[in-house]
Amino acid sequence: MKASELRGKDAAGLNQELSELLKAQFSLRMQKATQQLQNTSQLKKVRKDIARVQTVLTEKANAK
């Protein structure tokens, strides 16, 4: 997911995306804890995506 794609969305869409990413992160953490996670790089990707969404939300809030 690119920041340029995120900037095209409105705040409600970004909040929904953030909620989905947080659920995915929780799920991945639980899989890691129970040693069921095969691809651990997914954790890093989701964490970076969460940061991107939060950054764009902050940019939109400060622009007002």
Curated annotation (Swiss-Prot):
GO CC term, one of those recorded: cytosolic large ribosomal subunit
InterPro entries cross-referenced by the UniProt entry: Ribosomal_protein_uL29, Ribosomal_uL29, Ribosomal_uL29_CS, Ribosomal_uL29_sf
A GO BP annotation: translation
Keyword line: Ribonucleoprotein, Ribosomal protein
Record-linked HAMAP family: Ribosomal_uL29 (MF_00374)
Superkingdom of origin: Bacteria
Pfam families xrefs: Ribosomal_L29
Name of the protein this chain belongs to: Large ribosomal subunit protein uL29
Family: Belongs to the universal ribosomal protein uL29 family.
A GO molecular-function annotation: structural constituent of ribosome
